[in-house]
Amino acid sequence: MIGILKKVFDVNQRQIKRMQKTVEQIDALESSIKPLTDEQLKGKTLEFKERLTKGETVDDLLPEAFAVVREAATRVLGMRPYGVQLMGGIALHEGNISEMKTGEGKTLTSTLPVYLNALTGKGVHVVTVNEYLAQRDANEMGQLHEFLGLTVGINLNSMSREEKQEAYAADITYSTNNELGFDYLRDNMVLYKEQCVQRPLHFAIIDEVDSILVDEARTPLIISGQAQKSTELYMFANAFVRTLENEKDYSFDVKTKNVMLTEDGITKAEKAFHIENLFDLKHVALLHHINQALRAHVVMHRDTDYVVQEGEIVIVDQFTGRLMKGRRYSEGLHQAIEAKEGVEIQNESMTLATITFQNYFRMYEKLSGMTGTAKTEEEEFRNIYNMNVIVIPTNKPIIRDDRADLIFKSMKGKFNAVVEDIVNRHKQGQPVLVGTVAIETSELISKMLTRKGVRHNILNAKNHAREADIIAEAGMKGAVTIATNMAGRGTDIKLGDDIKNIGLAVIGTERHESRRIDNQLRGRAGRQGDPGVTQFYLSMEDELMRRFGSDNMKAMMDRLGMDDSQPIESKMVSRAVESAQKRVEGNNYDARKQLLQYDDVLRQQREVIYKQRQEVMESENLRGIIEGMMKSTVERAVALHTQEEIEEDWNIKGLVDYLNTNLLQEGDVKEEELRRLAPEEMSEPIIAKLIERYNDKEKLMPEEQMREFEKVVVFRVVDTKWTEHIDAMDHLREGIHLRAYGQIDPLREYQMEGFAMFESMIASIEEEISRYIMKAEIEQNLERQEVVQGEAVHPSSDGEEAKKKPVVKGDQVGRNDLCKCGSGKKYKNCCGIGK
């Protein structure tokens, strides 16, 4: 084990040594860069760009470009990057992750590779976790880049399309990860290429890279729209589920919250709905509705998981107990609960476009990131993103005191000890940061401190703007700050001058299931060589301890007669906790890896569709593409109607009927003509007739209008079929894990069936486009329209408004319907005369 660790450490050391040589080259250039005037320094940017056009690479320019940025940062920001920051910049430029401890100046470090890569003119994206940090960094570091003659843009959710286009056209764009992903999806839903906002994805530097690529990796970005589905099935499924009995008709696993029909339940369903086989492909929707109705009745409880308020179902947040108005369960569960509670069933939302951060960021030509804690997830970064983690040494040695965990018998004893420790440190004037896993824990400690008369601030992820002020005060004498884990990342706690020799105390009230989050909390203290102390308080009732068998330890504490106020301080327990954390991290990594394998199936399909859409948008003339689609459609139709071996069994009449209905006009192709030909010869005369009809259609209108008509048809069909396909893939994914019970690999099945569904969708697209082109009447006022309005949805944000408005059509009145004027006559005999 020690050998392996040494080996790993040596690899990092070798990288550091190699980068140290480049740092020495940069230092050597300082004497020639320092005497330059501001204008001469700015002129270097143009010089670098010219050298790139003459064949030099960004790697060749690195030492000189870094020296220029260092000098500019000293003049503009009053900050001169240290040698270790130059190393961090080199690691980022090489497409790796720089692990730099809190307070080591990651934001300034990023300016070096950002400047160097922006010289190519292809655009650099600097990615942050929230808009407050994006604006702060764009404003502060933007001064430096603008001084050197580069343009800086900021991409916010509230911006118009034109503002976004301007932000992305800049050399450097600051943005949140959510907004980048949503813009990519929206760009692949637009109907005119002028509406796209992003350029090809060149280079991204992700701040807090572990938060975005690990913690949020499993959360998909979704653009959803209203599905045009009937609510009747929800009512029927609800009525049926009410007749079922627990254990007999369905089984429920309390641990996993998994509920499923038994054999008896399946038989009951087949009888109730008068069908032979519930698992037949044509009953996929019915099975989905029954499963969701079961979940609504068995798993979801009123006033625990949701409340009924003003005739609506409102979700209750399991972590905070707060109501989450406007949020809805997906995949029809919300509608199933509405049916259960007898309130109005609202339309199910339908996924129009979706992507995970894993797949979005893997599309960049080059990707890098920085964080204080990445080494524990090194395997994941290397395997999934092809990025190595390089631990950058600190500028000054760390002198922080990390103490062994204190373990108490009960939660009550633990919290009493935590509060006592805070009170004692507060009296000495030492600033204290208390880290909690959940918001309710922070509120409990807050109440206990209020009773003791200790003034304190609470920091959680609700207010990013206020966050900066609270963090700024957190290092002052006697300050007490309670923070949930992720809150305050990206902002430094700077110590007040009067307590520089004491340092910050960090108290953890519980171990998180990830070592990385614990390390982030520890890293808040002892920044830039300051003193500091960190201490974790645990109890046998903590979730991590409960999950990994602390019963023996609790029994031992009872036998020893230890009460609530006596902690155990044991390296053995700390090691046990750490191995439990490693197990959880391993499970989480496996889950993310599996998610990626499933998501890759949809990714490959998405890339094909988006690439074709792009080609259609940029193409001036689609006629060649459409003729190819018609040829495929005809060949499939011929093969389908002539697949029997005996000629007499061929359905030539069916083929002629199909062609007349979908592609040609009556009499264009005659049955007796086709009977004289072999199957492989039939397609040719049919296609020749199709092209003749296509030419006739061309003569009826100006060429420009015909070309636009083709685009309108292609977009309408492709977008409709693709959204239906995503929905179908969702349903397939939901039920695929059941195949494992039949000793079949669910992933392999998903890949095979997903591919078959995709092939079928392509055939359906080709057929429908051919039919519309040949049979549709062409309107004079042609306009490309969206199939359905999309809205950006990300489970970790409060939902983001879509930029587009739906096209609303007026109600159509049939000629034989009653006239809307109220005369009682039919429309054709009243207001519709002559229409």
Curated annotation (Swiss-Prot):
Q: Where does the record place it?
A: Cell membrane; Cytoplasm
- Binding locations of ATP: 85, 103-107, 492
Q: Which residues bind Zn(2+)?
A: 819, 821, 830-831
Its membrane topology is listed as: Peripheral membrane protein
Q: What GO cellular component is one of the record's annotations?
A: cell envelope Sec protein transport complex
Q: List, alphabetically, the Gene3D superfamilies matched.
A: Helical scaffold and wing domains of SecA, P-loop containing nucleotide triphosphate hydrolases, SecA, preprotein cross-linking domain
Example GO molecular function term?
ATP binding
**What top-tier enzyme class does this entry carry?**
translocase
Q: Does Transcription regulation count among this protein's keywords? A: no
Tell me the InterPro entries matching this sequence: Helicase_ATP-bd, Helicase_C-like, P-loop_NTPase, SEC_C_motif, SecA, SecA_CS, SecA_DEAD, SecA_motor_DEAD
Describe how the cofactor binds.
Answer: May bind 1 zinc ion per subunit.
Keyword field: ATP-binding, Cell membrane, Cytoplasm, Membrane, Metal-binding, Nucleotide-binding, Protein transport, Translocase, Translocation, Transport, Zinc
Its cofactor is:
Zn(2+)
Which reaction(s) does the protein catalyse, per the Swiss-Prot or TrEMBL entry?
ATP + H2O + cellular proteinSide 1 = ADP + phosphate + cellular proteinSide 2
Record-linked Pfam families:
P-loop_SecA (PF21090), SEC-C (PF02810), SecA_DEAD (PF07517), SecA_PP_bind (PF01043), SecA_SW (PF07516)
Q: Which domain of life is it from?
A: Bacteria
Q: What is its EC number?
A: 7.4.2.8
Which biological process, per GO, is one annotated for this protein?
intracellular protein transmembrane transport
Give me the ranges of the annotated region Disordered.
Answer: 788-807
Residues of the signal sequence?
Answer: none
What is the similarity comment for this entry?
Belongs to the SecA family.
Q: Which NCBIfam families match?
A: PRK09200.1, PRK12904.1, secA
| Biological role | Part of the Sec protein translocase complex. Interacts with the SecYEG preprotein conducting channel. Has a central role in coupling the hydrolysis of ATP to the transfer of proteins into and across the cell membrane, serving as an ATP-driven molecular motor driving the stepwise translocation of polypeptide chains across the membrane.
Q: How does it assemble?
A: Monomer and homodimer. Part of the essential Sec protein translocation apparatus which comprises SecA, SecYEG and auxiliary proteins SecDF. Other proteins may also be involved.
PANTHER family according to UniProt: CHLOROPLAST PROTEIN-TRANSPORTING ATPASE, SECA INNER MEMBRANE COMPONENT OF SEC PROTEIN SECRETION SYSTEM
Q: This protein is called what?
A: Protein translocase subunit SecA 1
Q: Which organism is it from?
A: Bacillus anthracis
Q: What is the lineage of its organism?
A: Bacteria, Bacillati, Bacillota, Bacilli, Bacillales
* Gene behind the chain: secA1
